Design a protein with these regions (language model features):
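Secretory targeting signatures
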Residues: 1-33, 38-50
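C-terminal catalytic histidine-bearing segment of alpha/beta-hydrolase fold enzymes
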Residues: 259-293
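Primarily recognizes the serine-hydrolase "nucleophile elbow" in alpha/beta-hydrolase
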Residues: 156-219
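Short beta-strand/loop motif that positions the catalytic acidic residue
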Residues: 237-238, 243-246, 250
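N-terminal cap/lid segment of alpha/beta-hydrolase-fold proteins
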Residues: 40-81
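Short substrate-entry loop that stabilizes the transition state in hydrolases
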Residues: 83-84, 89-126, 207-208
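Cap/lid segment of the alpha/beta-hydrolase catalytic domain
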Residues: 106, 116-155, 210-213
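Short alpha-helix in the alpha/beta-hydrolase fold that links the catalytic acid
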Residues: 229, 254-262
Length: 293
């Protein structure tokens, strides 16, 4: 992957003292990363505000804003009165709420809560940088200073969403994501044992760790790269279920890359090929709803 190589080159340069600039404000949430690159997170408590946007006999839709140490994070929740399970959903790059309105109603009608999290930097209401070279530059700088990277905060956002749903509805909550969002969700499910399981659609590792290893890099760049890779955590989800879905002709994330990540998961697990293109679609919705019913 060219993008992974470019980012890897930056990490090497940054380590050599190229003057990476980070935020000097101490973070309230804390983390540690072991020599094997495994991330441990202690997410700061967050307050939240929920405004009901629509409600009928089938479901209630609300806008939820988490007030975090680094700014507000927005999510949209659709749920029946008593959901039998819930899905914290991390969207793919550039995915907007508008593309999930019908999906939210469908899940709620089937008895499930669907919580769309507007990931930091994804171009929606929540500010931040999208995953890419600029974010890696910023986050690796913070990592080197012991400050909280945005990537880690995004994982905390998913954990906060899980806590809200679990406390409010006392129901199993699955970390779910499509494409890039599936990567964030895998890390969250591996770090937080209270997630009921993991559902990933059209997703894989980022490829950054492999790129650095191929270049013979060692030290902090490797630890940081490992700490953000889904493959570092997906094996830790067992004995909770791992469900993955991928299109054989996916034009964005190769089918083989999805299989490779799936191969690192423990049982119980299931890898399903679906029709379509890239990302979550109605066929995948049917599979998820049926398998979790």
């Amino acid at each position: 992957m060219r993008s992974a190589f470019v980012i890897a080159f930056f990490l090497i340069t940054c380590l050599a003292g190229a003057g990476c600039i980070g935020n000097s404000t101490p973070a309230k949430s804390t983390y540690s990363v072991g020599s094997n690159g495994v991330l441990s997170l202690s997410c700061a408590p967050e307050t939240m505000n929920e405004v009901v946007l629509f409600s009928n006999e089938t479901y209630t839709k609300s806008r939820v804003v988490f007030h975090t140490e680094s700014g507000n994070v927005t999510g949209y929740l659709a749920t029946p009165t008593v959901p039998k399970a819930a899905f914290v959903y991390a969207p793919g790059a550039g995915e907007r709420l508008a593309g999930h309105e019908e999906r939210m109603v469908r899940y709620a009608s089937a008895g499930f809560a669907f919580f769309f999290i507007d990931t930091r930097g994804n171009g929606g209401e929540t500010p931040g940088l999208p995953f890419g070279q600029q974010l890696i530059q910023q986050d690796f700088s913070k990592f080197g200073k012991g400050e909280m990277p945005q990537y880690y905060l995004s994982i905390c956002d998913l954990v906060s969403a899980r806590k809200l749903l679990a406390e409010k509805y006392n129901t199993p909550v699955y970390a779910t994501g499509s494409s890039n969002g599936g990567r964030y969700a895998a890390v969250a499910a591996g770090i937080d044992p209270e997630f009921a399981g993991y559902i990933g659609i059209s997703t894989s590792d980022w490829g950054l760790l492999d790129s650095l290893n191929e270049q013979g890099v060692s030290g902090d760049p490797i630890r940081f790269a490992a700490s953000i890779e889904p493959g570092t955590y997906i094996g830790k989800i067992s004995p909770r279920p791992v469900l993955m879905y991928h299109n054989a002709t996916d034009p964005i994330i190769p089918f083989a890359s999805g299989e490779q990540l799936f191969g690192k998961a423990g049982a119980p697990k299931n890898f399903t090929e679906f029709s379509g293109d890239h990302g979550i679609n109605p066929e995948v919705d049917t599979l998820i709803i049926t398998q979790r019913a």
